[in-house]
Design a protein with these regions (language model features):
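Conserved mixed alpha/beta catalytic, RNA-binding, or beta-rich assembly cores of soluble enzyme
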Residues: 73-78, 82, 86-88, 115-119
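Glycine- and acidic-rich phosphate- and metal-coordinating loops
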Residues: 63-64, 95-105
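Signal for well-folded cores of large energy- and translation-related assemblies
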Residues: 50, 54, 89-94, 120, ...
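Glycine- and Gly-Pro-enriched alpha-helical subdomains that act as flexible
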Residues: 101, 109-133
Length: 133
């Protein structure tokens, strides 16, 4: 697969959608990284993902569109999901990009620390899939 990255000012943008699955203690985390340039379009894409994964326990996300950033923990403990994903996007200087992680609960509580590490690892894994390391 050819990965297309290009610079917009000082930030990188992506042109494709990437997906990667991580499993921890029977919970499945599906990370989806995709280009987005409008918050309203993001809402539509998020709704599609939520519908496709309607049996998932959580759908957390972060996005950056120019100077606008947003993140959501979707009922996970505060600060364990959305914000760390946003920090990944900012650290990699990515712009016009969204990172959504869908969690299917595996029956075992992970605890805040392991939960945070797993969401971050899911984000790192999909960034590697997109050749952004």
């Amino acid at each position: 697969m050819i990965t297309l990255l290009f610079y917009s000012g000082e930030c990188m943008e992506i042109s494709n959608t990437y997906q990667c699955t991580t499993e921890v203690m029977k919970s499945k985390f599906i990370a989806i990284l995709f280009p987005i340039d409008d918050p309203d379009l993001f809402k539509k894409e998020l709704a599609k993902i939520q519908k496709e994964h309607s049996k998932a326990r959580h759908v957390v996300y972060a996005y950056r569109i120019d100077n606008k950033t947003k993140s959501c923990d979707d009922r996970e403990p505060k600060g364990t999901a959305g914000r760390p994903l946003l920090e990944l996007l900012l650290k990699k200087d990515l712009n016009k990009v969204a990172l959504v992680v869908v969690r299917y609960f595996g029956g075992t509580l992970l605890g805040a620390g392991r939960l945070l590490r797993t969401y971050v690892q899911s984000g790192v894994n999909v960034l590697k899939e997109a050749s952004i390391e």
